[in-house]
Amino acid sequence: GNIHAREYMTAQLCMAQIESYLKNYNGSVKGVKVKNVLNKMAVHYIPMANPDGTTISQFGISKIRDKKLRKALYKMSGASHTATWKANARGVDLNRNSNSHFKANHGGKRGSEGFSGTSAASEPETKAIAGLLKQLKNNKTLKGVVNYHAMGSIVFGSGGSGKVKKETQKMYRLARKITGYASGDSYGSSSGPSVGSMRDYVMEKIKSPCITLEIGVAGCPLPISQFSSIWRKNESLVLREAKLLL
């Protein structure tokens, strides 16, 4: 969750899911016996993939402790309205920085959103996510990935090939059934893959099924009033996706 800074309600959702699954380990969540799933499959979370960017979105550039970063940030596009910041503290959009369909310096200049970076996986956050995915893949324990963004109340499940495509479609159909979210697969289909997309990287380079859910319906940052509805639709989602992939 929270690869885009202003989408920090996804981190709140991930933490609430973790708490629910642990609290109900000997019971059930929405009819799913938690122990029966977690005794067979580990679920790895990255609740907040972009902590520095989230600090900017929540509290402003002044709360970034590194003096050089602060100085550079004040000169970037979006510095005057940091609540809607998406990038990390180096002005790189982490969902354009993965080593999949990457284009250097795509999106103009460093700023609040859209800039892909000078090279693929140039950012420490991107490296950390890729490192965990590779480790799990090498251990033959990676069965699937759920990617949380905001907003739109839609699910993305297109792309991939062979078994990855088949398993992704299974995850996608289940996610739509659980949440009632609309299909996002028509978005961007005519323009081809996105530059440096994390989901494309997971499916094409890591060779793992992956879906993306966009939570909420208001502009980001999502208002806290939306969380109860998001929670009702998503509490059991990761647990049920894990059960599906057993």
Where are each of the predicted segments found?
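Short beta-strand element of the alpha/beta-hydrolase
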Residues: G1-H4, V146
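Active-site/substrate-binding loop(s) of hydrolase catalytic cores
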Residues: Y8-Q12, A16-S161, T212-G219
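Generic recognition of short, well-ordered alpha-helical segments
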Residues: M9-L13, K166, S225
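MPN/JAMM (Mov34/JAB) isopeptidase/deubiquitinase module and associated MPN-bearing subunits/adaptors
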Residues: N97-S98, M203-E204, L237-K243
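Soluble or luminal CAZymes and related metallo-dependent hydrolases
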Residues: G117-A128, E167, Q226-K233
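Catalytic cores of processing enzymes, dominated by hydrolases/peptidases
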Residues: I154-G219
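His/Asp/Glu-rich mid-to-C-terminal helical/loop segments that flank catalytic regions of hydrolases
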Residues: L222-L246
